[in-house]
């Protein structure tokens, strides 16, 4: 135990109070501005302007700090409108610039830790480098052998103060955290991190990166404790638990609460060896070979864990127990199922022959066409029935830019859903995007689609939409090598770095 305390103090000594001065550096907001311009093509322009003055941002920060220390807190109008002005400037726009700058500054300590990993100062383990590339092969390889799955909607913090308190143990700069807390409380448009949306929650488009950073950091905190409890049999010697021991408050909670006389009675549920956990954004799945009783215990453990340790209100209905054999798992834009595939084998014994029926489990990944059409409709590529429409916003672009944008969207979707065994849904998406592209070009040239395609040639669009880049991909070897099997084989492209915008329909 003394060794872990020394490691904890060593990590604390490596923290530096350097973040606060960076808030006043113009290049920080230049980085935030440039990063804001590199957005998804589906997002409309939110007001970034090359003529925006970084000096105005610095003046706003200086004024806010003055108000904070004078305890003379000004109030903004609750109307979330671009007409809201402060000191003669667009408050919403410049507040967005300030928070984007904060996102750049706060990420610096974690980026430095990543560099120390890459430089070999600390050991790099594969479980610290997991990405979306590893999720799809994991599902295909492991899920067919599992029985039950917990479909989890991760709870959100009740208040932003919880996120700031969690961040405090890593960022040892009290001044910058006080300023961050002041911003979060003074801006009404930032007072709520999450906005209700049906049965789940979603982040506002505005300043999504900064709030996602706070949210993901909070999720990482409780996942580190979750991993520690999962590996409790190693008595704190597990490499995957070292990051957990770098914390202060939760270290004390382990010492006072976990290591008690009821230690084994409380944690016996973690003995399950075939337990798999995957998370992406606000959803997670916990799959196991265990019984329904075991999964039910995990469910209520997670609810109590979030409420007692992180003060996050969680309801049992946000965690559903499903049996993989009769349930479709909605995860990462795929509908995944594990179905029994019957197999008849004829056996011959001298004069008698008989049939033996065997059933093997097969993991299927399907592209949900209805939600995808809904996403295309929301992006104005088609109507709610799937009939293609023109994209008037892009009509001012050049012909090559219009074709390139439509083609890039299709290639991204084609790569993302390459793991689906049934490709008919992709063909329908291709039809919608091709005709939407043709109608956009015809609208630009004030012509009909038929006349424009006759003049341009259908082959040009067809060739562009089928053009493939040189991208590494991953397949699983199969025993059969006939053409039908090759056509239906899953192909996992390694250029997927995040879930596609149109696939994120929730």
Swiss-Prot record:
Top-level taxon of the source organism: Eukaryota
Keywords for this protein: Chloroplast, mRNA processing, Plastid, RNA-binding, tRNA processing
Record-level GO BP terms: mRNA processing; RNA splicing; tRNA processing
Subcellular location(s) of the protein: Plastid, Chloroplast
GO molecular function: RNA binding
Primary subcellular site in the record, as a coarse category: plastid
Coiled-coil residue windows: none
Cellular component GO terms held in the UniProt record: chloroplast
Signal peptide: none
Stated family: Belongs to the intron maturase 2 family. MatK subfamily.
Purpose of the protein: Usually encoded in the trnK tRNA gene intron. Probably assists in splicing its own and other chloroplast group II introns.
Protein name: Maturase K
Organism: Rhododendron tsusiophyllum
Taxonomic path: Eukaryota, Viridiplantae, Streptophyta, Embryophyta, Tracheophyta
């Amino acid at each position: 135990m003394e060794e872990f305390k020394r490691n904890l103090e060593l990590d604390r000594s490596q923290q530096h109070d350097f973040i606060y001065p960076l808030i006043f550096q113009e290049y920080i907001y230049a980085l935030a501005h440039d990063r804001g311009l590199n957005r998804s093509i589906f997002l409309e322009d939110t007001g970034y302007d090359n003529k925006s003055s970084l000096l105005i941002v610095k003046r706003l920060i200086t004024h806010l700090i003055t108000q904070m220390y004078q305890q003379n807190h000004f109030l903004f109008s609750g109307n979330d409108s671009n007409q809201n002005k402060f000191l003669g400037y667009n408050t919403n726009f410049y507040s967005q610039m300030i928070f984007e700058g904060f996102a750049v500054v706060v990420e610096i300590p974690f980026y430095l830790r990543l560099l120390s990993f890459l430089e070999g100062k600390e050991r790099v383990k594969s479980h610290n480098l997991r990405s979306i590339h590893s999720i799809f092969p994991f599902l295909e390889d492991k899920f067919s052998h599992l029985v039950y799955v917990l479909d989890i909607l991760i709870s959100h913090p009740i208040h932003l103060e919880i996120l700031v308190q969690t961040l405090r143990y890593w960022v040892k700069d009290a001044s910058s955290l006080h300023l961050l807390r002041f911003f979060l409380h003074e801006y009404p448009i930032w007072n709520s991190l999450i906005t209700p949306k049906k049965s789940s929650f979603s982040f506002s488009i505005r300043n999504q990166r900064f709030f996602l950073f706070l949210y993901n950091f909070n999720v990482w905190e409780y996942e580190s404790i979750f991993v520690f409890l999962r590996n409790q049999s190693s008595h704190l010697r597990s490499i995957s638990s070292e990051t957990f021991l770098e914390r202060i408050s939760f270290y004390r909670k382990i010492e006072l609460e976990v290591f008690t006389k009821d230690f084994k009675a409380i944690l016996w549920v973690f003995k399950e060896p075939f337990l798999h956990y995957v998370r992406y954004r606000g959803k997670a799945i916990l799959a196991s070979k265990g019984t329904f009783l075991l999964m039910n215990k995990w469910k209520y453990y997670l609810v109590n864990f979030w409420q007692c340790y992180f003060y996050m209100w969680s309801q049992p209905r946000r965690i559903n127990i499903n049996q993989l054999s009769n349930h479709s798992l909605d995860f990462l834009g795929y509908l995944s199922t594990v179905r029994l595939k019957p197999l008849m084998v004829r056996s011959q014994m001298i004069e008698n022959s008989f049939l033996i029926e065997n059933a093997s489990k097969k993991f299927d990944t399907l592209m949900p066409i209805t939600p995808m059409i809904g996403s295309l409709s929301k992006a104005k590529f088609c109507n709610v029935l799937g009939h293609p429409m023109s994209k008037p916003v892009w009509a001012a672009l050049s012909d090559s830019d219009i074709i390139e944008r439509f083609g890039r969207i299709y290639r991204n979707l084609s790569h993302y859903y390459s793991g689906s065994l049934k490709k008919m849904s992709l063909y329908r998406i291709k039809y919608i995007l091709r005709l939407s592209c043709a109608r956009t070009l015809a609208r630009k040239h004030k012509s009909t689609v038929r006349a424009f395609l006759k003049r341009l040639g259908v082959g040009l669009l067809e060739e562009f939409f089928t053009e493939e880049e040189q991208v590494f991909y991953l397949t699983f070897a199969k025993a059969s090598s006939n053409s039908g099997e090759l056509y239906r084989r899953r192909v996992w492209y390694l250029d997927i770095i995040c879930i596609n915008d149109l696939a994120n329909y929730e």
